[in-house]
Regions:
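Short, amphipathic alpha-helical interface elements at domain boundaries
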Residues: 18-19, 26-189
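Charge-enriched, short contiguous segments at helix-coil
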Residues: 2-86, 125, 275-346
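Amphipathic, oligomerization/interface secondary-structure segments
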Residues: 120-346
Length: 346
């Protein structure tokens, strides 16, 4: 997953019948079949894992508190972080409320740590922040890169979509899902495609993505550029540090930036991961979510329709994911590879 949250929703996950059935709304978080499946899978998996940890007398709440109260100050020399979770001897409604408060607390504490270099509780107490999880700052410059604009969307759709006009060829040498798979066979010639397909293929050649080799085979001009585009098509964002480890990958990012195909971002969570958090917690970027932070912050948690156990495990999942993203970032900046300011190289 390359430090990505894999459970987030992707627009291209929607099947054609889902596009037909869903009514477009301005602030609507896309919920494909895959997204719903992931939601149920992680709920049941985390519930089972927590039950196992409790039987071994090492509840997940203790592990999370150990990370913030012991590991950060003693292992990384970062002091001041604090969370307060409730144990299994209280009801799920109280436990869910405690986790919701901890998520909001870590949002404020980490934002303060990045901006001021320490967790300043006086500053946090008087700081009024709107909990938009897309905007938690990062210690790493240009942490992510994203596809940019309609030219990027048109290009990646042409290359990687199973609905692309380039998916099929006159001579099918092997069943393929997209144009990318066809070219990767290493046996496709321009004559293998229909006349109506020649114009978009020629456009790909003119833009430097394809070339015709001496024996007439269509090949990728720079496979590293194509792999980066494929990564962006399937996951919507990439972590720049991963691509900075290879000079070929770094050249691919430079090419895409010079082609105005990508833009850079420097937040703890990617734009898509931030929307995932917002979907569950508030109404900042979507209006069709459970709004769990608002639910527990405003005392609207009573009644037969409120499933506190489900809400608790969803909130606990978010706290674990947020903790893992913080851990990955803090470990990353102590690694020699992250000492390079990536923005100077792209």
């Amino acid at each position: 997953s390359r430090n990505r949250i894999v459970a987030i929703s992707h627009e291209h996950d929607l099947r054609p019948f889902e596009y037909i059935c869903q009514i477009p709304q301005k602030k609507h978080y896309t919920q494909s079949i895959y997204f719903r499946w992931y939601d149920l899978f992680y709920y049941s998996t985390l519930a089972a894992y927590c039950s196992l940890l409790e039987r071994t007398h090492h509840p997940l709440e203790d592990i999370l508190e150990w990370f913030y109260h012991r590991y950060l100050p003693e292992g990384l020399g970062i002091k001041g972080f604090h969370i307060n979770l409730l144990r299994q001897n209280v009801g799920f409604n109280a436990r869910a409320e405690a986790v919701a408060n901890c998520i909001e607390g870590i949002f404020n504490q980490y934002s303060c740590y990045v901006s001021k270099g320490s967790v300043d509780w006086d500053y946090i107490q008087y700081q009024s922040l709107k909990e938009d999880y897309r905007k938690i700052p990062s210690l790493i410059k240009a942490k992510y890169f994203y596809g940019k604009g309609k030219p990027f969307q048109s290009l990646t759709y042409l290359l990687f979509s199973d609905q692309s006009i380039l998916r099929h060829a006159k001579v099918i040498k092997e069943e393929c899902n997209c144009f990318y798979d066809l070219i990767c066979q290493g046996t496709m010639h321009l004559d293998d495609f229909a006349d109506y397909q020649s114009e978009p293929i020629q456009r790909l050649i003119n833009k430097g993505y394809l070339y015709i080799s001496g024996d007439g085979v269509l090949s990728w001009t720079n496979p590293y550029v194509i792999r980066a585009l494929r990564d962006l098509y399937h996951f919507d964002f990439c972590e720049t540090a991963y691509y900075s480890q290879s000079s070929r990958n770094l050249e691919a990012i430079q090419f895409l930036q010079e082609s105005d195909m990508i833009l850079l971002g420097e937040t703890l969570l990617s734009e898509q991961e931030g929307r995932y958090f917002n979907y569950y917690l508030n109404t900042i970027s979507s209006s069709n979510g459970p709004q769990l932070r608002n639910l527990y912050a405003h005392g609207k948690v009573y009644g037969p329709k409120v499933n506190h156990e489900y809400n608790y495990y969803v909130l606990l999942r978010l706290l674990v994911l947020l903790t893992m993203k913080i851990y990955d970032e803090l470990i990353g900046i102590t690694d020699w590879k992250s000492l390079i300011d990536i923005t100077r190289r792209i």
